[in-house]
């Protein structure tokens, strides 16, 4: 009986930290991020994951999309002077 109680206590307390860490990974995946040791050049750090990993999300470019051609032919070069 003591062995059963001991194993139950060990398994119960062992599962608690793992559930806590799962929360961080779930939060990162909800924002389409990935947990990794370091972010790439085209990624930004948006949150922290477990075991000192970083939640990195790909940076969206702020340039005009292919479908947006409203300023084409206006003579504007798009550079700052």
Curated annotation (Swiss-Prot):
Q: Where is the composition biased (Polar residues)?
A: 62-72
A GO BP entry: defense response to bacterium
Against InterPro entries, the record matches this protein to: Beta_defensin_dom (IPR025933)
Please give the tissue specificity annotation from the record for this chain.
Only expressed in epididymis (caput, corpus and cauda).
Residues spanning the signal sequence: 1-20
User: Briefly, what is this protein's role?
Assistant: Has antibacterial activity.
The name of this protein is Beta-defensin 34
Protein species of origin: Mus musculus (Mouse)
Q: What is the lineage of its organism?
A: Eukaryota, Metazoa, Chordata, Craniata, Vertebrata
């Amino acid at each position: 009986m003591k062995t059963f109680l001991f194993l139950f206590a060990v398994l119960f307390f062992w599962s608690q930290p793992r559930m806590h860490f799962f929360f961080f990974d779930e939060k990162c995946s909800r924002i389409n991020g990935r947990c990794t040791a370091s972010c790439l050049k085209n990624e930004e750090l948006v949150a922290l994951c477990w075991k000192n990993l970083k939640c990195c999300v790909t940076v969206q470019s702020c340039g005009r999309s292919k479908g947006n051609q409203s300023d084409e032919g206006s003579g504007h070069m798009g550079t700052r002077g």
